[in-house]
């Protein structure tokens, strides 16, 4: 039962994290994971207001003056080969990466 809840949570996080036009369904995302197509994944990028690419963790967008949350610079590869980075809450980035690793392990065991 716990596994189903974790998979459901991962599904929700992945669906919100992935662009809808890139992946129409979770099944296609899993197929890409199985085939290894995710390594050089490029996405269409949008203009950013909190770009942290140049400074990574030292950028002001990654600092919370009230020290309420920790932020982490999260990057994706754009279609033109350019990297785009934004600051996100550290917990969000780490939870998303845990879900991706979990889904990869499940796919390896099932596939």
UniProtKB/Swiss-Prot annotation:
Contains 5 disulfide bonds. Cleavage of the propeptide depends on the processing quadruplet motif (XXXR, with at least one of X being E). A motif (Processing quadruplet motif) lies at residues 40-43. Residues 1-19 form the signal peptide. The keyword Secreted applies. Keywords: Amidation, Disulfide bond, Knottin, Secreted, Signal, Toxin. Its main location: secreted. GO terms for molecular function: toxin activity. The keyword Disulfide bond applies. The presence of a 'disulfide through disulfide knot' structurally defines this protein as a knottin. This is Latartoxin-2b.
